[in-house]
Amino acid sequence: MKPRHKRLAIAGGVLVAVGAIATLVLNAFQSNLVFFYSPSQVVAKEVPDGRTFRLGGMVEDGSVKREGVMVSFVVTDTVQKVPVRFEGILPDLFKEGKGVVAQGKVEGGTFIAKEVLAKHDENYMPPEAAEALKRAKEGGQMQSSQAATGDPR
């Protein structure tokens, strides 16, 4: 094999290897990417089917029901509600009326959580959760004012 052909074969092999590595890295990154959604977005079906995502909002008062290690509760953004089921031990700071972020999937209208994170301080809320609650509240106020005035905008 001539040196020129040898260099060309090596360059081609390097390009194929770099392409394969880039494909594997991007695939791993995409499969580990977890998005945050509010209850209003989940109810509006803005969540991709079968994807793991984070659901954030407030635990509705009076909604926590425990059956052994199985816990069910409702997460709300003050406009919409999503029932959540979790099997495991909840964080110590998990309480009704407090902020929560759960990671899992929607199955049959219920969010099946694999992980539940409670707010660590009564004044702290993740920026994504605060923004989602604000948008949901503004959307709910707009809908109620439109219903009151009869304006279909």
From Swiss-Prot:
Gene Ontology biological process terms in this record: cytochrome complex assembly
Cytoplasmic-facing ranges: 1-7
Comp. bias intervals (Polar residues): 141-153
Transmembrane segments: 8-28
Entry keywords, A to Z: Cell inner membrane, Cell membrane, Cytochrome c-type biogenesis, Heme, Iron, Membrane, Metal-binding, Signal-anchor, Transmembrane, Transmembrane helix
Topological type in the membrane: Single-pass type II membrane protein
Location(s), subcellular: Cell inner membrane
Spans annotated as Disordered: 130-153
Binding site for heme: 120, 124
Classification via Gene3D superfamilies: Nucleic acid-binding proteins
Signal peptide: none
Pfam families: CcmE (PF03100)
Chief place where the protein resides: membrane
Periplasmic side: 29-153
Cellular component annotations (GO), alphabetically ordered: plasma membrane
InterPro entries associated with the record: CcmE (IPR004329), CcmE-like_sf (IPR036127), NA-bd_OB-fold (IPR012340)
GO terms of molecular function: heme binding; metal ion binding
General function of this protein: Heme chaperone required for the biogenesis of c-type cytochromes. Transiently binds heme delivered by CcmC and transfers the heme to apo-cytochromes in a process facilitated by CcmF and CcmH.
PANTHER family: CYTOCHROME C-TYPE BIOGENESIS PROTEIN CCME HOMOLOG, MITOCHONDRIAL
Family per record: Belongs to the CcmE/CycJ family.
Name of this protein: Cytochrome c-type biogenesis protein CcmE
Native source species: Leptothrix cholodnii (strain ATCC 51168 / LMG 8142 / SP-6) (Leptothrix discophora (strain SP-6))
Gene that encodes it: ccmE
